[in-house]
Amino acid sequence: MARQATFIVALCVCGLAIAGLPRLASAGDLATEQHEGDIGYGVRAYAGVSNYDGDDDAAGNPVDSDVTDDAITDGEWPRVVSGQKPHTTQKGSLIKKLAVPVVGALTSYLVADRVLPELTSAEEEGTESIPGKKRVKTAVGIAALVAAAAFAGLGLARTFRHFVPKKSKTVASEDSALGNSEEQYVEGTVNGSSDPEQERAGGPLIPEGDEQEVDTE
């Protein structure tokens, strides 16, 4: 009985460690990604300031003709925030996933401990044949041990899958949102919404051939 209680306590401790370590690792990776994302946002925001190509405005200050800071000054550059499920939801779903493996492993081990017979020294050495009843119990006990190991492996696999795919989906969603925002910003620049020629001229550019005659009278 003491051996069974020791095994149950050890299994519970191992389960808590298995459930806690991946979460700590994922939390550290998420904090690192968020910090790198903030740094990348700052680099993108001020990337056009140092790309001087020789153009000057009316006051003689250098102006970048390729990159404008309209979206930066107006605060229109999108900030990508990765969504996460609440901590209680993640914990509850992990407990549900580990319930069957833990119960199965404990039950299988208790069955194996109950069924496996104790062999005599002569039977262990092979000098005496093992009776058929003991052979059947030994086979059932070994099968129960194999089932306990299988349930333990299932619990480890579910714990691993609970954390790893979520991280990859978060990174993919951030990359997709960032790519869409950059495409929209570039499209707006190409279509003339942030034309540097228009900004230096102080008004919209009038295409050739569309100039209207001005009445001077």
From Swiss-Prot:
Asked whether the UniProt record includes Membrane among its keywords, one would answer no
Specify the domain of life of the species encoding this protein.
Eukaryota
Where would you find this protein in the cell? Secreted
* Compositionally skewed regions (Polar residues) per UniProt: 171-183
Specify whether Glycoprotein is a keyword of the entry.
Answer: yes
Please state the span of the N-terminal signal peptide per the UniProt entry.
Answer: 1-19
- What this protein is called in its record is Dense granule protein 1
Q: Where is the composition biased (Acidic residues)?
A: 208-217
Q: Which GO terms describe its cellular component?
A: extracellular region
Please give the family membership noted in the entry: Belongs to the Gra7 family.
Q: Which residues are glycosylated?
A: N191
Q: Which UniProt keywords apply?
A: Glycoprotein, Secreted, Signal
- Segments of this protein annotated with the region Disordered: 171-217
